[in-house]
């Protein structure tokens, strides 16, 4: 995982006049980005027939028939 490394005082951005006590860090750097950029290059894109197809879902609920029946019995309220 990447770590954010703090900058030293020389690389801090100063704002305001010299008498003001204000500093703001304007940059950060990442360490070990090889896993971020090279992680998924071995995975192939899906074939055209696979795009948009849902995986099979198994619903294990004893009262699913009652729930589905109740939804279809309800009539939409007047709009």
From Swiss-Prot:
Keyword annotations of the record: Cytoplasm, Nucleus, Protein kinase inhibitor
Domain of life where this protein originates: Eukaryota
GO molecular function: protein kinase inhibitor activity
Disulfide bridges in this chain: none
Signal peptide: none
Transmembrane intervals: none
Family assignment from sequence similarity: Belongs to the CAMK2N family.
PANTHER family registered for this protein in UniProt: CALCIUM/CALMODULIN-DEPENDENT PROTEIN KINASE II INHIBITOR 2, CALCIUM_CALMODULIN-DEPENDENT PROTEIN KINASE II INHIBITOR 2
Pfam families listed in its UniProt record: CaM-KIIN
Predominant place of localization: nucleus
Localization: Nucleus; Cytoplasm, Cytosol
Function: Potent and specific cellular inhibitor of CaM-kinase II (CAMK2). Traps Ca(2+)/calmodulin on CAMK2.
Keyword Metal-binding: no
Protein name: Calcium/calmodulin-dependent protein kinase II inhibitor 2
Keyword Nucleotide-binding carried by entry: no
UniProt region (Inhibitory domain), positions on chain: 43-69
Gene Ontology cellular component terms for the protein in this record: cytosol; nucleus
């Amino acid at each position: 995982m990447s770590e954010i490394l703090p900058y030293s005082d020389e690389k801090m951005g100063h704002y305001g006049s010299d008498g003001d006590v204000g500093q703001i860090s304007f940059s950060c750097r990442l360490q070990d980005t090889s896993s971020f950029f090279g992680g998924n290059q071995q995975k192939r894109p899906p074939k055209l027939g696979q795009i948009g197809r849902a995986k099979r879902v198994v619903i294990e609920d004893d009262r699913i028939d009652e729930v589905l029946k109740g939804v279809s019995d309800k009539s939409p309220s007047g709009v």
